Amino acid sequence: MTQPWDAGRATDEIRSIARNPKLSITYKLHARERLSERGLIISDVLHALRFGNVHRAPAPATRPGHFRYQIECRTPNSGSRSIGIVVVPAKDECLLTIVTVMWLDEFERVAGSIIGATDDG
């Protein structure tokens, strides 16, 4: 990928990758820590990737030609709260790299943007 996708296409592409039987997911350490901290599980991430929506513009990823997208969704384990997942898709590899997972209601109260977080670690 060399050009970022708009929100609608990003939603469709991420959902398509997430539903592909060849899907491979990697989790950055930060994402694994946030999942544990928030009491969320892998199936919550999969649900959000398969059924969520991208509403925000992407940010460049550290991997050249790739971009970070935030996909948002309520999940079976999140109660009435929505989660946001910052993900770097690699369509040709059928790979989704999870950078972080957040509660959107907490994110909206904090200055700054997690989508700007580095996806290196």
Which residue ranges define each predicted feature?
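Ribonuclease/tRNase effector modules and their secretory precursors
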Residues: 1-121
